[in-house]
Every structure is written in C-alpha cells, then in structure tokens.
Amino acid sequence: MAVETIQKPETTTKRKIAPRYRVLLHNDDFNPMEYVVMVLMQTVPSLTQPQAVDIMMEAHTNGTGLVITCDIEPAEFYCEQLKSHGLEQQH
C-alpha cells in the first residue's frame, strides 16, 4: 500500500478593514456657541471641553468641523443625536 501526501494549496485570507466615517459639524447662525459645545460633549462622551470648543471654533471659522471619525453605526448615532439637538446643516 502506498501513502501519498497531498499538499493543500496556500491561500491567504485578507480581512477587509471597515471603512471609517466622519461626523461633521456645520456652522450655523442660530445656535449659541456654548450650546454647541454642551451638545458635543453630551453626544460624544469621549470629548473634553477643550476638544468640543476646538470643534465648534473650527466649524465657526471654516464652515465645518470634524467631530469624530468612527465606524458607521456610532457615526449614524452621533449624527442623529446632534440633529435631534438642532445641530444640522441649514439650507
């Protein structure tokens, strides 16, 4: 009886990296700056007050500010929370 070893062809499995989503804050002429900072800190618990102030000032100065970059589910949650507090892009 003969024994033969069959070699399995090498395959590499590459995991796709989940895309990251940016939550942006748009400047508006309606909400007071202090309110925007408070809402940012309530919505994104990892933000400190200086970070929230920086985001608000970036939006105020440049038109938009980057709130956070994250996976889609938290990004959608943060976006909805900000909108529910009146922080949404006005047309």
Swiss-Prot record:
InterPro entries: ClpS (IPR022935), ClpS_core (IPR003769), Ribosomal_bL12_C/ClpS-like (IPR014719)
Alphabetical list of NCBIfam families matching this protein: PRK00033.1-4
TM ranges: none
Self-association state and partner proteins as the record states: Binds to the N-terminal domain of the chaperone ClpA.
GO biological process: protein catabolic process; proteolysis
Organism: Synechococcus sp. (strain ATCC 27144 / PCC 6301 / SAUG 1402/1) (Anacystis nidulans)
Function: Involved in the modulation of the specificity of the ClpAP-mediated ATP-dependent protein degradation.
Lineage: Bacteria, Bacillati, Cyanobacteriota, Cyanophyceae, Synechococcales
Top-rank taxon: Bacteria
Family designation: Belongs to the ClpS family.
Official protein name in the record: ATP-dependent Clp protease adapter protein ClpS
